[in-house]
């Protein structure tokens, strides 16, 4: 975190301030206190790993986050926590590239733009209605 702050010409934070911010954010995402004592992703379930990614984004506040099939393997409760976390991070200074095969994620994180990739190329771009159409008719027409 301090590397990012320093690179942006901002004041670094001390270890106690960082630890407090980390605990508060972890608590908001439903993590137990013992999670912060583990190494990154050590002994985490699939859902915990996805929630931990949201924790990292909440702390680091990147300008661009790439979420590759972040809904994969999540139960409905974990999906809700992850999508609420992402929605809370949305701002004019942050962008998300969300890669998914399923409408259920896009029902909870409304995309500004949808791009369909087939055979390594973007074959269609537009609004959320593209994803809704794919949910109904599949990917067949995209090759």
What function would you assign to each model-found segment?
Residues 66-70, 77:
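Walker B catalytic motif
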Residues 1-62:
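ABC-family P-loop ATPase nucleotide-binding domains
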Residues 79-92:
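Helical segment within the ABC ATPase nucleotide-binding domain
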Residues 97, 114-115:
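Conserved catalytic/dimer-interface elements of ABC ATPase nucleotide-binding domains
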Residues 117, 121-143:
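Conserved beta-strand-loop-alpha-helix hinge in the C-terminal portion
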Residues 75-80, 125:
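Conserved D-loop-proximal element of ABC-family nucleotide-binding domains
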Residues 93-109:
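Conserved H-loop
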